[in-house]
């Protein structure tokens, strides 16, 4: 370990000299308290260090010690149900040790060193293994089996492996490598956060990831291994959408990064997730969740690390063959941390003061998503889906972070303040949002849910777009100038908006809709549209169609429980019968 001295302190940036062996991104201990920092620039003898803790009290002449290792995370049993800060320090352990506030320079191991885990081998002595092979399992929580893998760079023959209870640092197996060296394998691996974990092959993202949110799954779907962003102004519901995705997305593991957002939002997650039951296993959602809390009152520099910490943990679970969803809330705060450090380094600023390399850093982050064939001889498949929230100041989508994000992500869920103020949630604007996965998902849904899924979706989108142009006419000259056909379009589009797209996150039934239920709900509205068109052609007055009691049943369909979807067949019959009754009644009057 080489030691240098501080020559300058500027907020979270510390400049030091006397570290000749220092390398980029090495972790250093700064000052007498041993604050954790990372080398982010080397110019001759001078190294610039980004410190992940409050730097008040540091001054020139204080010592700086380099560890010679990059910023790494500990990967092994004990991460699930955990809540960590941006550099993977467990907050519950810190709270027991020093109370409610994190003491500067506190050094606690990320994974519990005392707890013993029951290890069950999957290979035996004499077997040949290579990087990524699963050599055994640990039942980490009731619903997640933690698969212990050979580290990526190691291959050879298993010399010794035993079942039993071990801590994460005790050897569970010994492998004789091809060069004859004996390597001891523990349940814990260390991995540098800025380096993507390796895989065999990247696959196209073709399988949809149902989220239970109708506007997302039907109109703007995301796939397993896909990338999505949620930009929106303050108060438009970004965090609630992220929470909904974390709760109901069809992923086996969820990593939730609270990066620079309010502390009470992380508190909500901590209070809600243990109470909520996973629809597939009926166990608390917390049993499959890792939380990274790096709230707005924590040091700015640690926000940058938190995003990388989160995605490295997510990649590790992906390598086991799991489908992982990563929520980053919000990447704007991360970009602001980059801007602050760039300013302190006196770099040439780009647009709005952000560094010129902002787009590259964002692309590097989102490119770590994907559906892959993992390392290992069993060719297992894993997927990592990344959803990043963006908080543009004033909801201005032309600002650099949003624009750089849009260049790399494939799904854009644009949150609209007008919809939010009108209490339409989720406030995803159906006219400006898009998904580049919709064609792939359409093929999948046509095969697996119903052959007319694609037609229904296209028709719904057409009606919503037609409604937008008709509303302009209505605003200018009033609704009376519209033909009855146009008035029907407005009425059906309103039904799509209010009865289908609008969803109550806090209602026990409406909070989640399966793909089957979404299809049945949309089909009801479209059957009503087709039957109402026939009734209009037969001369039935529009007012009678508009006021018919069957409309109420369509509106209440969202509250039908998943176990009672046969109710939709009855409502379909009622709609056809009601419209037929209107036609026959009109014919009798004539």
From Swiss-Prot:
Keywords: ATP synthesis, ATP-binding, Hydrogen ion transport, Ion transport, Nucleotide-binding, Translocase, Transport. It catalyses: ATP + H2O + 4 H(+)(in) = ADP + phosphate + 5 H(+)(out). ATP binds at residues 232-239. GO terms for cellular component: proton-transporting ATP synthase complex; proton-transporting two-sector ATPase complex, catalytic domain. It comes from the Bacteria. One of its GO terms (molecular function) is ATP binding. One of its GO terms (biological process) is proton motive force-driven plasma membrane ATP synthesis. Disulfide bonds: none annotated. InterPro entries: AAA+_ATPase, ATP-synt_VA_C, ATP-synth_a_Xtn, ATP_synth_asu-like_sf, ATP_synth_asu_arc, ATPase_a/bsu_AS, ATPase_F1/V1/A1_a/bsu_N, ATPase_F1/V1/A1_a/bsu_N_sf. Its EC number is 7.1.2.2. Produces ATP from ADP in the presence of a proton gradient across the membrane. The V-type alpha chain is a catalytic subunit. Belongs to the ATPase alpha/beta chains family. This is V-type ATP synthase alpha chain. It comes from Thermoanaerobacter sp. (strain X514). The gene is atpA.
